Amino acid sequence: MSFSAASLRAALEFHVPTGASGLVVALSGGADSSALLAAAAALGGSFRDLPLRAVHVDHGLQPAHAEFREACKSLCEHLGVALSVIRISINALAGESLEAAARDARYAVLEAQLKPRECLLTAHHRRDQAETLLLQALRGAGVKGLSAMPVCRAFGAGWHVRPVLDVPQSELTQFGAPLATPCVMDPMNDDLRFDRTYLRRLVWPVIQQRWPGVDAGLARAARHMAEAQELLDATGEADLARLRDGEALSVPGLRALTHARRLNAVRHWLNLAGAEAPSAARIGEALRQVLDADADQLPSIVWGELALRRYRHRLFLSVADPPRLADERLLPAAAGAQLDLGPNLGALRLVAQSGGLAADSLPPSLLVRRRAGGETLKPARSARTQSVQHLCQALGVLPWMRDALPLVFAGDALVAVADLWVDARWCAAAGAPGLAVEWRDAPIIV
């Protein structure tokens, strides 16, 4: 069956999640997205009664970008579809291609435009999918990369659906041919600086001459890879269920896995945390370093803003630059007093209760600061004074989080460490008024 409004409806029924609140077509002004919008408009709102609108992102890179913008406006007026035009400028980072920067900026705008539960529709077709797989293969991608583009994924406040991913480009072109408003040809499609354009103009014709069905074959291979990735994700989730130890992973458990399953489990763990996983080689080398280290070492591997850290027999994922308590600050020694400790550090609050710090013995204000080294404290129900360092080691406070611990002083005397320990010499007597230290919204420290 060739592409039509009816075939689009069938694809939308299958791929648009239940509960979607509307359809948003990403309209470039090219033939493919114009055909998709025309087919969606032909449904006349009959698909689940969902409203339809379009968004055009003008990044100004094409010499004819104004023509694209006007073509989009003309088409939407012709079809009776509401259009939003967003203008942006592109600034590629060092080492980043203009092609990648433009794509990322465009998707960032589209993501921001989505209202809750709206579905973004893009006109990626079978040829696009085949090209994506081939480009990923040339870059040495793994199974996930070779899955190319998913048909549906969570995106912003809603979803991103590619309803024509298995449709030949020729069918989209044929469907869009009768449109009253002609689409604009993108001159950037002839710019060989871009990898996809180079592949499309110089490499693809040679491959297609030898293998005429190459787009269908590669798109089918991408589907097989997507199914394989589902199995890898399921295996990773099953392994993580056995490996999880609080917020960390068990080092002995990781060691017991085969190399391939270990890599897969950690990659899945990183994905679930929203972290961009490095290459398999980098993950493998990082795991080798942290797993082979002696138990008394504190190996860590930093990737951008994140770090893998091992403490004793657990592996943690943390920020590369852990939060650190700022300079010393004052906290009124009164019930209800609260001190914000800074970003990602929560707040200290004093609560009236029997027990805790002896309210009558405290000065008007308490001093809160991070440890400087050498601090000691005699914990309640302990027979001797101990160093804060020793107490942290005994409790298993993560070494990289110890500078986040708020130490509470009455003058020069350390009276409490967060809500972990209170000095016995400053504890309220039975029945006497006391102030308990609460660390609210505290970061993970053990």
Which residues make up each language-model segment?
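Short, structured loop/turn "capping" segments at alpha-beta junctions
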Residues: 182-184, 213-218, 232
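AMP-forming adenylation/ATP pyrophosphatase catalytic core
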Residues: 3-32, 49-53, 59, 88-92, ...
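Core alpha/beta nucleotide-donor-binding catalytic domains of modification enzymes
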Residues: 1-210
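Internal, active-site/partner-interface "lid" segment
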Residues: 189-196, 217-226
